[in-house]
Amino acid sequence: MAKGEGHILAQNKKARHDYHIVETVEAGIVLTGTEIKSVRAARIQLKDGFAQIKNGEAWLVNVHIAPFEQGNIWNADPERTRKLLLKKREITHLENELKGSGMTLVPLKVYLKDGFAKVLIGLAKGKHEYDKRETIKRRDQERDIKKQMKHYNAR
């Protein structure tokens, strides 16, 4: 667990497969009371989510937080756009990186830190299909080498 992060509630494994992660930034999320209860129960899905910057503010889009079971009328829309809490300097830095560079912001993981929900946002560049195949091939080769070393050392 890097950067002093707490209990990991959700991870976006697909993001590391589909993108080259250039840089990561930790951000807070503005949630309602029933949403934080669902997040603490790990009922959050980051798979199709992304972040965008509008009017000098960062927003988390397409992240699904399941409705809290006992929340009835207080539950918010599960797919609503949520504000990210970042410093102005971080927002301008990310905005400059995103301009005309083919980069995007993807949520990598959600975790609790000192009782607050935090999201790790990655500044990412899309991978081509051959990059994905190369990554899978390299991972398989490393796995085979470890297996052979384990077998060799067991003698």
Swiss-Prot record:
Pfam families: SmpB. It comes from the Bacteria. It is found in: Cytoplasm. GO terms for biological process: trans-translation. Belongs to the SmpB family. It comes from Streptococcus pyogenes serotype M3 (strain ATCC BAA-595 / MGAS315). This is SsrA-binding protein. GO terms for cellular component: cytosol. Required for rescue of stalled ribosomes mediated by trans-translation. Binds to transfer-messenger RNA (tmRNA), required for stable association of tmRNA with ribosomes. tmRNA and SmpB together mimic tRNA shape, replacing the anticodon stem-loop with SmpB. tmRNA is encoded by the ssrA gene; the 2 termini fold to resemble tRNA(Ala) and it encodes a 'tag peptide', a short internal open reading frame. During trans-translation Ala-aminoacylated tmRNA acts like a tRNA, entering the A-site of stalled ribosomes, displacing the stalled mRNA. Residues 135-155 are annotated as: Disordered. Keywords: Cytoplasm, RNA-binding. SUPFAM superfamilies: Small protein B (SmpB). Disulfide bonds: none annotated. GO terms for molecular function: RNA binding. InterPro entries: SmpB, SsrA-bd_prot, SsrA-bd_prot_CS. Residues 135-147 have a biased composition (Basic and acidic residues). Its main location: cytoplasm. Gene3D superfamilies: 2.40.280.10.
